[in-house]
UniProtKB/Swiss-Prot annotation:
GO CC entries: cytosol
Cofactor or coenzyme needed: Mg(2+)
Superkingdom as given in the UniProt entry: Bacteria
Catalytic activity: diphosphate + H2O = 2 phosphate + H(+)
Name of the protein: Pyrophosphatase PpaX
Species the sequence originates in: Bacillus anthracis (strain CDC 684 / NRRL 3495)
Family: Belongs to the HAD-like hydrolase superfamily. PpaX family.
Length: 216
């Protein structure tokens, strides 16, 4: 089956928000629980929804913690977000070649739009599925299924690209092919344990992979 649709995660995949996310967690946690959390303690928080993460820390303060996190995140967004090499050119080329492209993210829509505008990727994506659009987040298949439905695409004709196991397992649960990115903060070896179909060393690796898949 040929691939005509590519779904991307956003954070850590299309744009480098790692420092923004880590700083947002550290600021919030230091405000409420001074000196209890270090940088390495918050790395596992990257990937799950804010609600899931903060529920495990203090169920009585979840909404308060999310509000604090998002305020810091918005205030410092543009200074801490960076681009990844070859992302813009690759997505531009995919659109030029006629691929359907969408984003499936666990972020809130307002912050997603900030990141897409800053990176100038907003012109390329017709479909962006955020946490505001679904009941279940990745690795549940619902967000991917919603994106595929909106793009009028079939799972077997789609590839999910991401930097976290939520993306890879989410793709597998939805029935798509999967590609992991080696620049993940979690480390290449960690993602390899989830058996993605492909591993990208840079985003432009996608182009020959898709070309080969669609030739066979």
């Amino acid at each position: 089956m040929k691939i005509n649709t590519v779904l991307f995660d956003l954070d850590g995949t299309l744009i480098n928000t790692n420092e923004l996310i880590i700083s947002s967690f550290l600021h919030t946690l230091h405000t409420y629980y001074p000196n209890q959390y270090k940088r390495e303690d918050v790395l596992p928080f990257i990937g799950p929804s804010l609600h899931d993460t903060f529920s495990k820390i203090d169920e009585s303060k979840v909404e308060e913690l999310i509000t604090s996190y998002r305020q810091f995140n918005h205030d410092h967004h543009d200074e801490l977000v960076e681009e990844y090499e070859t992302v813009y050119e690759t997505v531009q080329e995919l659109k030029k070649q006629g691929y359907k492209v969408g984003i499936v993210t666990t972020k809130a829509r307002q912050t997603v739009e900030m990141g897409l505008k800053l990176s100038k990727l907003d012109e390329f994506f017709d479909v962006v599925v955020t946490i505001d659009d679904v009941e279940h987040v990745k690795p549940h298949p619902e967000p991917l299924q919603k994106a595929l439905q909106l793009l009028d695409a079939k799972p077997e004709e789609a590839l999910m690209v991401g930097d976290n196991h939520h993306d890879i397992v989410g793709g597998q649960n939805a029935g798509t092919k999967t590609a992991a990115v080696s620049w993940t903060l979690k480390g290449r070896a960690y993602l390899e344990t989830y058996k993605p179909d492909f591993m990208l060393d840079k985003m432009s690796d996608l182009l020959p992979i898709l070309s080969d898949m669609n030739r066979s």
